[in-house]
Amino acid sequence: MSSAPRRPASGADSFRTPEPEILGPATAGFPEQEEDELHRTLGVERFEEILQEAGSRGGEEPGRSYGEEDFEYHRQSSHHIHHPLSTHLPPDTRRRKTPQGPGRKSRRRPGASPTGETPTIEEGEEDEDEASEAEGARAPTQPSPASTPSSVQFFLQEDDGADRKAERTSPSPPPPLPHQEAAPRATKGAQTGALVEEVMAVAGGTAGGDDGGASGRPLTKAQPGHRSYNLQERRRIGSMTGAEQALLPRVPTDESEAQTLATADLDLMKSHRFEDVPGVRRHLVRKNAKGSVQSGREGREPGPTPRARPRAPHKPHEVFVELNELLLDKNQEPQWRETARWIKFEEDVEEETERWGKPHVASLSFRSLLELRRTLAHGAVLLDLDQQTLPGVAHQVVEQMVISDQIKAEDRADVLRALLLKHSHPSDEKDFSFPRNISAGSLGSLLGHHHGQGAESDPHVTEPLIGGVPETRLEVERERELSPPAPPAGITRSKSKHELKLLEKIPENAEATVVLVGCVEFLSRPTMAFVRLREAVELDAVLEVPVPVRFLFLLLGPSSANMDYHEIGRSISTLMSDKQFHEAAYLADEREDLLTAINAFLDCSVVLPPSEVQGEELLRSVAHFQRQMLKKREEQGRLLPTGAGLEPKSAQDKALLQMVEAAGAVEDDPLRRTGRPFGGLIRDVRRRYPHYLSDFRDALDPQCLAAVIFIYFAALSPAITFGGLLGEKTQDLIGVSELIMSTALQGVVFCLLGAQPLLVIGFSGPLLVFEEAFFSFCSSNDLEYLVGRVWIGFWLVLLALLMVALEGSFLVRFVSRFTQEIFAFLISLIFIYETFYKLVKIFQEHPLHGCSVSNSSEADSGDNATWAGTRVTLGLGNGSSAGPAGQGRPRGQPNTALLSLVLMAGTFFIAFFLRKFKNGRFFPGRVRRVIGDFGVPIAILIMVLVDYSIEDTYTQKLSVPSGFSVTAPEKRGWVINPLGEKSSFPVWMMVASLLPAILVFILIFMETQITTLIISKKERMLQKGSGFHLDLLLIVAMGGICALFGLPWLAAATVRSVTHANALTVMSKAVAPGDKPKIQEVKEQRVTGLLVALLVGLSIVIGDLLRQIPLAVLFGIFLYMGVTSLNGIQFYERLHLLLMPPKHHPDVTYVKKVRTLRMHLFTALQLLCLALLWAVMSTAASLAFPFILILTVPLRMVVLTRIFTEREMKCLDANEAEPVFDEREGVDEYNEMPMPV
């Protein structure tokens, strides 16, 4: 039947909840009362016009004949694929029209409800007018000319159509139905509160009244998502659809309604019904909000719709993106040539040299991104394509392009041929193995292949219509139906070195994205396809390396199109390399998800104005702005629960998420107090000792052996250096022998029992300063230095027990960067000062003389010859004497001062240069690291050889005894009498030793706990945990016991511990070019530290070699440690800013977030505290410098918080140091910690 035009229903009418009404039949005249009831029941405002015209005209209007022009219009307007706007959109929102064949029943959905209630839509942000206009614009279908007026049918479920199948067998008009036979549909549920639209069905019978009509029955609620047909059946072009068998015609409306509408209305209707308009959202209503309006179809049992195989859940993987462009080779043959690739950053192929350029951040044009979004909005999108070969994928893509009217049917073979062209890569000419481009299949074998109509159809394969004209098509057999061809005998495919090297950089389980772009002149307009395979498969001869492919992007078009194909290819490649976008591509269910992901990418992109940039400094703000946007993006991502795409909405969900995060943080906190005596110590034992056996099994690795050799020299060099200087300070009461033995013994015990065996314990600068101060105090008060150390050790053990019992290790959290930097800067100044002080002293003992001045005043020429000839012997006996001159050590030797200066400066500059060389660009990285790590031993060796080669100049040597002996056997033995060696030790000093014990405990506590904090940072990814309480107790207790033997105290050495941890860190080989290396694992074991301690102890047997080391060389190492420990100290950097104009200040947080004067005020306060400490150390009260140092903690907590705001303190006193694993120039372990060496 033909219907009169109807006007769009309003938004209020479209979403009214109907009342339960009884629907009866309508006679030819339709009385007024029944018309009112029908109005109230169906709520369609112009239902009166439809039915009256149907009753009046009936079958009198002759059928319209269609010509070739009409069929051409039908083909051009009906082959657009209809994609749902959202997965949440219920099926009943997509209107479907049945063709006007004989016996067809027209159907209509009610547009409004009889009640005046206006319900709310769950998606409250949508525009109701747009949806209502779209609903009202849908027109009735045109009847067959031979048919009589038929009723409107509404089916809510498949069984409705089954029950009424008999009623559709005759073209006769239906008889009237009783008014009381229809029943209401189920209303909305109280639990969900969702809107349920009540739809009443009017059943029609045959004209002859064979069965007299079917009685009405209560309608059940439609199951969401059920359809009476498969959406995949709509994927066919119009030319394949016969008029009499057409199931789903795509004409926008019928002729009668089209005559009353303007051209703009028709275009809008066609666009709304058959296109997926980008940027326009329809009303999103949950599936359970409405029932589905289904339709039975003639000639088919309306049973359950056969469903495609369920989509496997897609877990996002790392991606490898390859951009291939359609270019001509040397023989002027077209081929796909790789021009760029993305692992994380873009790498381009240099055209002239055919080699890969440096990785860089991809810079995209804004227009290319807009063009990409437009092509994705209108191109072909195939998600979860079930194909295993490139020809199979290409065939599906080409068919989809034909269906979506992107290409003509006659261009099918040309596009398919272009997709199957050869792929070439820059590394092909470098490889001499079997060529990679093995034919994946003969294109000629595909041309004569017919599609079997009886074969099982794939959901993505178009099948010919029943009764339609058969058409010759290109078809590829499924891979499961054909056995793979056997390779030729004797030929194997081996990976080249280039492939192996590239595969190391690609993350494990990565999946590839192939981007194909190019110009072809046989197309009249660009065509695009985005494909996601159901399962990742390796496509032969496509990629540079054998990585399974999951995504393909194709863009072909003529050169006349106003489109830059290369830039669009770079844009989609960059998008796929972006983490958020490729995760969205994995989880996308439809085209809208991809478009939304592109919009999210644009939200975090930066657009540069088209202005000329004179220097790179002008672009610094761009990087900072980008970091801010990425930080905001990450913060928004953290708010989302893992595995969900929604933000926690309620306050309870957010509170629960915060509680879970806080619980995880508290559970892993080793400094958390238990409230029980020794509770922290017990937790340390329970946490660490269960891994005791694995601490030895994990050492069975070649990397551990290399770490032993490296750490041995890293531990021996400071032991020799500090031992020699300690002998100078204590008149050989404690020297190299004692320090080596203490390092070995305490190192062995700590590695066997400690909670964090990655710590390297050793002597340090702060302990050297304390030993010098305590020795001066004992000398001035006629006290025995070694006996006093015994009583200090006794009190140290008691203090450690008290601290561990009270779980006092948490106090290390209050030692902020403010105190650490003052401490580290003070020790560095002491190192540098002592170096030049010793050098000046050498110049005083051996002054420079003119050439004409005789040296007889000091010694005659014979004596000089004797000193020169016996320099080694004198050096062995007097090399480390620190007492007044006259103990057999020569004075006034010519050139001694100059040679000492050369040795000191040479040692410093060689060690410093090798440290810089480690992060330089010469030689491979492995060679540079070896040279840089052994920089200090290499510097010592070179300078010792230089000194040994100069035989006629005297230099003071290191004092090392022969064999297992103390440094000065005539002064002391291996066991110290606590009551006094030469005289009785005063009792008051036994008690007063508590004060220096507190001071040295402060030093050991700060160094050990802060070092443990640095080692235990979460960035290092340690798995076995640490033990603050257990390690502190062991180190202090061992120091107290070693004092009985006259051995020095030790603490956790920060630089050596960090070096040890870095040496045992295994970095991932799958590092994208240009990216920072990531930690794969850390070899947490006890064997390396144990072997290093044993080797240091055995070094006592190489005393003959150690006695050849001049003290000037040790002064150079001392200077090196003082200078390098200044790196990474923010206080030192802010001192530079005092002399620098603000425009040259660096782009760091404490400069940008804090005003310059306030920043300088903070620096001045630190400088004042440093000056106070230096003044204390220059007086007789130098022993109390640890107490003055610890006072800076309450100063920072009480005074500075009143001067500076909380935000300023976070910027100026924040610990931003991170573990350093990459090879940035001038950055190493010293930059990681503001702690003294």
UniProtKB/Swiss-Prot annotation:
Annotated GO biological process: bicarbonate transport; negative regulation of CD8-positive, alpha-beta T cell differentiation; negative regulation of CD8-positive, alpha-beta T cell proliferation; osteoclast differentiation; regulation of actin cytoskeleton organization; regulation of bone resorption; regulation of intracellular pH; transmembrane transport
Record's compositionally biased regions (Basic and acidic residues): 37-49, 58-75
Record lipid sites (S-palmitoyl cysteine): 1169
Bilayer topology term: Multi-pass membrane protein
Classification via InterPro entries: Anion_exchange (IPR001717), Anion_exchange_2 (IPR002978), Anion_exchange_CS (IPR018241), Band3_cytoplasmic_dom (IPR013769), HCO3_transpt-like_TM_dom (IPR011531), HCO3_transpt_euk (IPR003020), PTrfase/Anion_transptr (IPR016152)
Positions with biased composition (Acidic residues): 120-133
GO CC term (a single one): basolateral plasma membrane
Swiss-Prot/TrEMBL keywords: Anion exchange, Antiport, Cell membrane, Glycoprotein, Ion transport, Lipoprotein, Membrane, Methylation, Palmitate, Phosphoprotein, Transmembrane, Transmembrane helix, Transport
PTM sites of type Phosphoserine: 113, 132, 144, 170, 172, 239, 439
The keyword Nucleotidyltransferase is annotated on this UniProt entry: no
SUPFAM superfamilies with a match to the protein in the record: Phoshotransferase/anion transport protein
Stretches for region Membrane (anion exchange): 704-1237
Main location: membrane
Catalytic activity: hydrogencarbonate(in) + chloride(out) = hydrogencarbonate(out) + chloride(in)
GO molecular function, one term: chloride:bicarbonate antiporter activity
Low complexity bias (residue ranges): 137-151
Region (Disordered): 1-237, 286-316, 445-466
Sequence positions bearing N6-methyllysine: 270
Disulfide bonds: none
Keyword Translocase annotated: no
Biological role: Sodium-independent anion exchanger which mediates the electroneutral exchange of chloride for bicarbonate ions across the cell membrane. Plays an important role in osteoclast differentiation and function. Regulates bone resorption and calpain-dependent actin cytoskeleton organization in osteoclasts via anion exchange-dependent control of pH. Essential for intracellular pH regulation in CD8(+) T-cells upon CD3 stimulation, modulating CD8(+) T-cell response.
Family: Belongs to the anion exchanger (TC 2.A.31) family.
Protein name (Swiss-Prot/TrEMBL): Anion exchange protein 2
Species name: Equus caballus
